[in-house]
Amino acid sequence: MLGGIFSGWCGRRGRGRAYEPPDELRLRESLAVLNVILPAPLAAEDVMASAEAARRLARADTLARTYQACQRNLECLARHEASGDDGLDAVVAAHAANARRLADTCLAALMHLYLSVGAVDADTDDLVEQALRMTAESNVVMSDVAVLERTLGLARRRQPAPVRAAPAGLGLPVPAQPAPRATAARPAPPPPPEEAGEDEEGDRPEDDAAPLLPPRAPAKTRPPEKARRLAEACKM
C-alpha cells in the first residue's frame, strides 16, 4: 500500500504499463528482415524513438517472415515437373495458388502498415491483427485469406490448370478438326441444241448401218401421145 502511494507521488508507472525496449540485436535482425521488402529502409534509431514504432516493427517482422516463407515455398513448388499423376499435380497447383495468395496478403498488409506510420489508424491495426492471427495458425484457412483480399482490394488471379505431360513415345492428341459443311451440288448446264442433235443422231443404229439392197431404177414413163391413144382404145 505504501509502495503504491510512493509510486504515485514520484510519478512512476506500474510494471504492467512500463515499456521495456527490445534487445538491440533482435531489433536489428527484425529491421534486416523488414528492409528487404520495404521501398525505403528503416533505421534503428527511428524505431527505438517510440513504443508505437517498436510495436509496429514487431508486427511487421512477423508479416515479413511469413512472406519470405511463402516465397521459399513457391520457389520449391516451381521446380516440380508435371508427371502422369493427376492427383499429385492438382495438389501441387493448389499449394502454389494458396502460397501465392498468402504471400500477396502479407505483403499488402505490410505495405498498409508501412504507409500508416506516423498516423493513428484503427483500421490498419485491425487488418494487421487479423493477418497476424491468420499467419500464426498452423492450418491457414483460405476463407480468411479471401476476406483479407477483399478488404485490402487484392484482385483474385486465376491459376492455369496443370497440363498433364504425355508419356514417352506417345504424341500429344491431335485436336479434332471441325466437319466440313455440306454444300448442295449445282446441276450441270444443259448442252446446246446443235450438240444435242448431233449426239442423238450419232446414237441411232440405223444411221451407222450400210444399206443391204441396191437402189431401184427409176420407172419408165410413156409419152403423153401414146398414153392418150391407149386410153381411147380402152373406151371403144
Curated annotation (Swiss-Prot):
Residues 160-186 have a biased composition (Low complexity). It is found in: Virion tegument; Host cytoplasm; Host Golgi apparatus. Signal peptide: none annotated. Keywords: Host cytoplasm, Host Golgi apparatus, Lipoprotein, Palmitate, Phosphoprotein, Virion, Virion tegument. Belongs to the herpesviridae UL51 family. Oligomerizes. Interacts with UL7; this interaction mediates UL7 incorporation to virions. This is Tegument protein UL51.
